[in-house]
Structure formats: structure tokens, C-alpha cells
């Protein structure tokens, strides 16, 4: 059982990275903030005004997402370094990372769909480009993130019991 729990912790850490956009695999220079790139993509669909995304509400949502993603990335990095220095392996905090990562990944694709407008409605056929179809399908795929590695509800229970030490 201990081995199975440890494997799930590693799986949750991997899934958590998806909320960063591609498992956190983007290359960056030291101290460089990587944004989601959604603002650039949104300008293509929603237009731009004075070099900014024309829709101020969508612009605010994307900026908020990028800020939260950067904070999450730094938190995961800090937890990873703490884990390495103590040689303790993944902690119950992996449930927090998995939960937040899967929710963040869903939000990322929902924002892309919002930016794409009616171009996000396609499944196949003319009128939709390959990238648009891929984003729509990936959005549907994000729903599985809240199931794999333990459902979001299970993660919240683990967080309540093992991280926050709340009574049952």
C-alpha cells in the first residue's frame, strides 16, 4: 500500500505540471517569467486595440491566469527543492498540486475557448483550422485531469486530512 501511495504522489505531481501548460517543460532563462501565450492567441480572435487585447475582461482573466500560473510554478519549484533537501520524496502536498494543476489546466483551455468565440465550437469540417480543432479536443480532455491520479474530491479529502489536519 505504501508503494501504491508513493506512485500516486508521483503521478499527481506530474499531472499538477499540466496546469502550467505542457508539464512545465518550457525553456526559460533564469528569473524570466513565461506567460501562457494566451494573450497573443486571443488577439488573433478577439482583436487588439493599441497593442492590447481588445476585450478588457478577457485581458484581465488572462493576466490573472498568468500571474497565478507563475506563482504556482514557483511554489512547485520550492516544494521540489525542499523535498530534495530532506530526501523525503513527494509529500501529501502533491494532492494540493494535483488539484490546483488540474483545475488550472481546465481554466487555461476554457479561456482559450472564450477567446476563440464561435471558432471553438468545431469538432471537424470546413471553417475550423487544425489548431482550433485541437484546442477544442484538448479542452474536452482536460475534464479527465480531475479524475486521473485520484479525483478532485479525493484530493480535497486528502488535503483536509493530511495537510490541514482537519477532523473527519
What are the roles of these predicted feature ranges?
Residues 60, 99, 158:
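Short alpha-helical basic/polar micro-motif
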Residues 1-21, 119-168:
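Glycine-rich phosphate/cofactor-binding loops in nucleotide/flavin-utilizing enzymes
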Residues 6-13, 44, 68, 77, ...:
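Short, well-ordered loop/turn and helix-capping segments at boundaries between secondary-structure elements
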Residues 1-73, 145, 161:
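Glycine-rich beta->alpha junctions and the first turn(s) of the following alpha-helix
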Residues 54, 64-68, 89, 93, ...:
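Secondary-structure capping and boundary motifs in well-ordered enzyme cores
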Residues 56, 70-127:
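C-terminal helix-coil-helix/basic helical segment that borders enzyme active sites and/or dimer interfaces
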Residues 48, 52, 89, 119, ...:
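Short coil/loop linkers at secondary-structure junctions
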Amino acid at each position: 500500500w505504501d508503494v501504491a501511495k508513493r506512485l500516486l504522489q508521483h503521478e499527481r505531481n506530474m499531472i499538477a505540471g499540466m496546469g502550467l501548460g505542457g508539464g512545465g517543460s518550457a525553456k526559460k532563462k533564469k528569473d524570466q517569467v513565461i506567460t501562457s501565450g494566451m494573450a497573443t492567441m486571443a488577439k488573433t480572435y478577439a482583436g487588439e486595440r493599441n497593442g492590447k487585447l481588445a476585450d478588457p475582461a478577457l485581458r484581465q482573466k488572462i493576466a490573472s491566469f498568468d500571474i497565478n500560473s507563475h506563482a504556482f510554478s514557483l511554489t512547485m519549484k520550492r516544494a521540489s527543492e525542499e523535498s530534495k533537501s530532506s530526501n523525503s520524496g513527494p509529500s501529501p502536498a502533491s494532492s494540493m498540486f494535483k488539484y490546483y494543476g488540474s483545475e488550472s489546466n481546465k481554466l487555461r483551455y476554457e479561456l482559450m475557448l472564450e477567446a476563440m468565440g464561435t471558432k471553438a465550437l468545431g469538432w471537424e469540417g470546413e471553417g475550423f483550422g487544425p489548431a482550433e480543432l485541437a484546442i477544442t479536443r484538448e479542452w474536452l480532455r482536460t475534464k479527465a485531469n480531475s479524475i486521473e491520479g485520484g479525483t478532485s474530491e479525493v484530493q480535497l479529502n486528502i488535503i483536509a486530512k493530511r495537510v490541514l489536519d482537519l477532523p473527519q
